Structure formats: structure tokens, C-alpha cells
């Protein structure tokens, strides 16, 4: 496989990578709110996404799959900036309220994706993964589950503290790879879409609705109560739209790590 080493902020490197290919998956970015200053995150992520989209269009690439984030909703891990959802489960019609530089960079990237799609020269879709839980984080997840109130992490040698926000959302990297493959292989994308990618459960010790109500001290409008009746630990996000559009359903449930 040919490899081209460069930066997405360097258009020459990006166009060289796009020439002669049918599709592009754009994942390269500063990956979270801790990966740089606000200026650095916005500069690298926004310019990088623009260069990928512009280069793909010029190279006549047929499809681009953008990696966005569930943080565009405003459910951020930045202290003091979390926006509570207006209803549950959160679907693709939910208002976007990014409150940190990373989330804002992803919303801008989605908007650019829609703009390029509307030009009519290329198919574009954006996927919004939650916290990607790699195997080297399993020890941290177990440590947090044993003592949720006092866990600070990293406690047992993991690369960072266990993530996923207040609901302990996660998705297995194998499911992430599968979702991106589904987005590449679905025959037609008739419109621009932004789809949530998550496991079918959270890693929180208590059911989702109970935890959300206690966390925010309020009740929520539950638009699809059957989701939480059938699966009390279902994520905040409606995954049915993802299945409908690209045929993806998560396979890996890691709640066994809690016991």
C-alpha cells in the first residue's frame, strides 16, 4: 500500500493522497480538547477538513467519509460547558450546541461537508463516534467501576483516565472500523448525513434514564421510550438512523468489564 506522509494542513500532501482513489476516510485531526490550544485545534481540524474536501473534489473522488464527534451536541467533557440534551434519545435532528474548541471544529467540518455535498460533485457523510475504548483502557474502566465516586485516573497504568463523559459512553474500535466500512460501501448516499456511532450500551453502573435524571436533576422528554424499556443501559443516542442509512449495528458490548 502506498503511503504519503504529510499534514492535512498542507494541501499538496492532501491532493497527492487523493489522486487516483475512489473514496477517502478523513480521520486525521487533533483528537480531543486536550490535544492543543483552542487556536491549534480549530486551525488544524478545520483547515485539514477543508483541504481534504477540496482535494477530493478536485481529484474526482466519489465519496468522503468524515470523522466528526458526538460532542457537537454540546455533551462535552470540558468542565462547566456541558449542555444537557433537549430530549432522549438524541437523534440527528437535535440542535447542535458545541461549547468547546474540538466540538466546534467538528461542527464546522460537518458544515463544510454539507456544502461540498450540495455542489453535486461528490458524496459525503459524517460519522459521530463517542469515546473509542481501546483494550489498553480496560483496566481504567474496571478501576472506575469499582469506586466511581473517588476514581480520578489513570489509576492502574492506563494511558489516560477512563472516558466517555457522565454516561460513560464508549464504542469498541472494531465497531468504529466497521461503521466506516459500511459508510464506504453503502451503494448510494442520496443526501448529506451525520450519524452517531456508539456501542449499544453505556458502561455506567445505573440505567441511562435514571443516571441522566440524577445527574442533571431534571426529567427528560423520552421520545422513544421503548429503547430504554428494552435496553435500560442504551446510550443517549438514537442508533436506528445509523442502521437505516448505512446498515451498521454495533457488535461489541463491553459491560462485562464492570463485573
Predicted regions and their residues:
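Conserved Rossmann-fold NAD(P)-dependent oxidoreductase catalytic core, especially the SDR/UDP-sugar
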Residues: 51-99
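NAD(P)H-binding glycine-rich loop region in Rossmannoid oxidoreductase-like domains
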Residues: 1, 5-44
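Glycine-rich NAD(P)-binding loop of the Rossmann-fold in SDR/ketoreductase-type enzymes
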Residues: 9, 23, 40-48, 59, ...
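Glycine/proline-rich active-site loop of Rossmann-fold NAD(P)-dependent oxidoreductases
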Residues: 119-123, 134-148, 161, 183-194
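Conserved catalytic Lys-bearing alpha helix of Rossmann-like short-chain dehydrogenase/reductases
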Residues: 46-52, 61, 105-113, 173-176
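Glycine-rich "substrate-gating" loop/helix at the edge of Rossmann-like oxidoreductase active sites
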Residues: 99-102, 130-150, 154-155, 159-174
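Mid/C-terminal beta-alpha module of Rossmann-like enzyme folds, strongest
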Residues: 177-239, 244
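Catalytic helix-loop patch of NAD(P)-dependent Rossmann-fold dehydrogenases
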Residues: 43, 78-124
Amino acid at each position: 500500500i502506498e503511503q504519503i506522509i504529510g499534514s492535512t494542513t498542507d494541501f499538496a500532501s492532501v491532493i497527492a493522497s487523493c489522486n487516483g482513489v475512489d473514496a477517502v476516510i478523513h480521520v486525521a485531526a487533533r483528537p480531543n480538547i486536550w490535544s492543543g490550544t483552542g487556536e491549534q485545534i480549530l486551525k488544524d481540524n478545520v483547515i485539514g477538513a477543508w483541504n481534504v474536501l477540496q482535494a477530493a473534489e478536485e481529484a474526482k473522488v466519489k465519496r468522503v467519509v468524515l470523522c466528526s464527534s458526538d460532542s457537537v451536541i454540546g455533551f462535552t467533557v470540558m468542565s462547566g460547558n456541558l449542555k444537557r440534551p433537549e430530549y432522549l434519545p438524541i437523534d440527528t435532528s437535535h440542535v447542535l450546541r458545541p461549547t468547546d474548541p474540538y466540538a466546534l471544529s467538528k461542527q464546522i467540518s460537518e458544515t463544510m461537508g454539507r456544502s461540498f455535498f450540495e455542489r453535486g460533485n461528490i458524496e459525503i457523510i459524517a460519522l459521530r463516534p463517542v469515546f473509542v475504548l481501546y483494550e489498553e483502557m480496560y483496566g481504567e474502566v474496571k478501576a472506575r467501576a469499582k469506586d466511581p465516586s473517588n476514581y480520578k485516573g489513570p489509576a492502574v497504568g492506563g494511558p489516560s483516565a477512563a472516558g466517555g463523559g457522565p454516561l460513560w459512553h464508549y464504542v469498541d474500535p472494531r465497531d468504529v472500523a466497521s461503521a466506516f466500512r459500511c459508510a464506504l460501501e453503502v451503494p448510494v448516499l442520496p443526501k448529506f448525513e451525520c450519524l452517531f456511532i456508539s456501542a449499544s450500551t453505556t458502561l455506567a453502573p445505573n440505567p441511562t434514564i435514571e443516571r441522566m435524571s440524577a445527574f442533571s436533576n431534571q426529567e427528560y422528554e423520552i421520545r422513544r421510550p421503548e429503547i430504554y424499556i428494552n435496553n435500560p443501559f442504551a446510550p443517549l443516542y438514537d442508533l436506528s438512523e445509523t442502521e437505516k442509512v448505512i446498515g451498521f449495528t454495533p457488535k461489541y458490548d463491553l459491560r462485562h468489564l464492570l463485573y
